[in-house]
């Protein structure tokens, strides 16, 4: 099953996350199908903090992909 989740990047104590569509059997930071955006929790500017390709996420969800809890919360905040 395809799941849309966060993949951790960045260095120690400076996390940066990519929002990716991947198979749920793959490791968190492993191979993914498509990159759908990013989330930078450390950034102060809102424009550099989060970016989500909502059209692509909607496409994956229509094909049966599930959202992780954290991505679901981020998507809700991004739409506001």
From Swiss-Prot:
Disulfide bonds: none annotated. Keywords: Ribonucleoprotein, Ribosomal protein. Gene3D superfamilies: 3.30.1320.10. One of its GO terms (biological process) is translation. One of its GO terms (cellular component) is cytoplasm. GO terms for molecular function: structural constituent of ribosome. Belongs to the bacterial ribosomal protein bS16 family. This is Small ribosomal subunit protein bS16. It comes from Wigglesworthia glossinidia brevipalpis.
């Amino acid at each position: 099953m395809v799941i849309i989740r966060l993949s951790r990047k960045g260095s120690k104590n400076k996390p940066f996350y990519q929002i990716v569509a991947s198979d749920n059997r793959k490791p968190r930071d492993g191979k993914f199908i498509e990159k759908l955006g990013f989330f930078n929790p450390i950034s102060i500017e809102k424009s550099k903090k989060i970016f989500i390709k909502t059209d692509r996420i909607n496409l994956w969800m229509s094909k049966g992909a599930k959202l992780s809890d954290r991505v679901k919360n981020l998507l809700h905040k991004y739409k506001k």
